[in-house]
Curated annotation (Swiss-Prot):
Reaction equations catalysed: Mo-molybdopterin + GTP + H(+) = Mo-molybdopterin guanine dinucleotide + diphosphate
Gene Ontology MF terms in the entry: GTP binding; metal ion binding; molybdenum cofactor guanylyltransferase activity
Protein function: Transfers a GMP moiety from GTP to Mo-molybdopterin (Mo-MPT) cofactor (Moco or molybdenum cofactor) to form Mo-molybdopterin guanine dinucleotide (Mo-MGD) cofactor.
Gene Ontology annotations of biological process type: bis(molybdopterin guanine dinucleotide)molybdenum biosynthetic process
The protein's required cofactors: Mg(2+)
Domain notes: The N-terminal domain determines nucleotide recognition and specific binding, while the C-terminal domain determines the specific binding to the target protein.
UniProt KW keywords: Cytoplasm, GTP-binding, Magnesium, Metal-binding, Molybdenum cofactor biosynthesis, Nucleotide-binding, Transferase
Protein's UniProt name: Molybdenum cofactor guanylyltransferase
Subcellular location: Cytoplasm
Amino acid sequence: MRAGQPKITGAKITGAIIAGGQSSRMQAGGVSGDKFLQPLGSAPVIAHVIARLQPQVDTLFINSKGDLSRFAAFGLPAVKDIAMNHGGPLVGLLTCLAHASPCRLLLTSAADTPFLPCDLASNLIRKQAETGARIILACSNERVHPIVGLWHTDLVPDLEKWLQYAEKASIFWFAKHIGFEVVNIPLAHAPRLAESYDPFFNINLPDDLLKAREINEALQA
């Protein structure tokens, strides 16, 4: 497990790891427990996410709607979802934005993406400075990753309203409603891997976990 690069200077950033989802596809495949707590090399999946994000931000916390005691070993604040009639990842995003609101910018990631770029924050901040957009999302292999993004924390009222009235309660559709820019991140390489891999590769299925272990072993070589 390798740490990220030093955080970019000139902007205060709060980071949030959103540990949502039910891990249902993983459990249906015979793997019990939370997908982000599965072992990946010498540490759980989420520990790799922490190691890559923490050096890029000023403060970092974990968000979840479940039992927060699961995260006690990681030494980070854990914030439970705001109680709302709606559910899903947008509530997690709202919780993170509200918790980070003393800071101007929030960097988010899922808890099951262990190979995040070590220069993710600097690339997203650069795009935000160039465009002035309130939402910057990561993109790789022609696919936008709505959970991985840089958000202006003044979006809280917009998101609260969206959750009240919107029919499409997804992060992507909220971002599309507000307007967003993307940063295209190239596929990554490891010397012992025959093929490149997506730095936003996420773990949903048992086969994904096996692939993640293969990538991790190659990165540690």
